[in-house]
């Protein structure tokens, strides 16, 4: 189920403030965040955001194609080790 359009997108307030402050100053520092549910806004383009996956922070460089998606989509939480294969004797 998608979010209601009348509510608007969820963007973490602290994350948005940090990115807007970096846009004004012209800095390009990595911003750490635990807000995986936060929507990527056009202000985030060109910045690197380190998204927590439950174990460590995964750096995500935001491009124009990512706008509208959520940050958690780009930092996988599970590692796929492959299906069980035939045992070789």
UniProtKB/Swiss-Prot annotation:
UniProt cross-references to Pfam families, sorted A to Z: Ribosomal_S19 (PF00203)
SUPFAM superfamilies: Ribosomal protein S19
Keyword list, A-Z: Ribonucleoprotein, Ribosomal protein, RNA-binding, rRNA-binding
Coiled-coil blocks: none
Matches recorded under InterPro entries: Ribosomal_uS19 (IPR002222), Ribosomal_uS19_bac-type (IPR005732), Ribosomal_uS19_CS (IPR020934), Ribosomal_uS19_SF (IPR023575)
GO cellular component: cytoplasm; small ribosomal subunit
Biological processes annotated in GO: ribosomal small subunit assembly; translation
GO molecular function, one term: rRNA binding
Sequence similarity: Belongs to the universal ribosomal protein uS19 family.
General function of this protein: Protein S19 forms a complex with S13 that binds strongly to the 16S ribosomal RNA.
Identification of the protein by name: Small ribosomal subunit protein uS19
The organism of origin for this protein: Parabacteroides distasonis (strain ATCC 8503 / DSM 20701 / CIP 104284 / JCM 5825 / NCTC 11152)
